[in-house]
Amino acid sequence: MRVVTIVITLLLIVSFGMLRLGDWLTPADPLPEHIDLIVTFASEQYRVNYSRELMLKYPDAHWFLSDYKNGYSRLLEKNRFDMKRVSVVDTCTSTLAEVRAAAGWIADSIPPEQIPASGSRRPYTIGLISSPYHMRRIDFMAHRYLNSPDLRYVLLPVPLGKYRWEKKTFRYWWRNEFITSITISEFVKIGYFLLTGYL
């Protein structure tokens, strides 16, 4: 009887966890008062456009843009965006590579005096931009590579409405074939990274 009770309890826990999976995969932080660096992952139209909006909102921020064959950076330049505020990398083949590249860029390009001391009320703040369903995996990776008392990162996914999604789109992720596919894919990728020690 005790074994049956344990099994039923575990099944209920797993079932509840799966029901909440979509919400868990899509964390988001509120916009901070300031941002020093905006990091855009795997550039696509919605991510680049939202990042550009944030760059206009935070005029002192720098933009670290992961682009493919410099496609979006050329469009930005064509539209007269101030490219002195943008650093482009087009060599990354994975999200993990992008996080590592951003961490390397910070280490190589930001003078130590520009990064406030530990415990400062205004830490060097990094806004991480991607699609909503990528954010939990990015959070794990950023915790591994951007976890420093002198740095603060915030998760700023492209707002759901820009994709014509709603909060319930991911809350009820099993109702839509595409959302089901990306939800399961992200869950598997997170598990893979954890199991292989990448995080």
Which residue ranges define each predicted feature?
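Membrane-water interface at transmembrane helix exits
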Residues: 18, 22-23, 192
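Hydrophobic membrane-insertion alpha-helices, especially the h-region
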Residues: 2-20
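A transmembrane-helix-recognition feature enriched in membrane-embedded lipid enzymes
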Residues: 174-199
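A structural signal for short, hydrophobic/glycine-enriched beta-strand patches
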Residues: 23-174
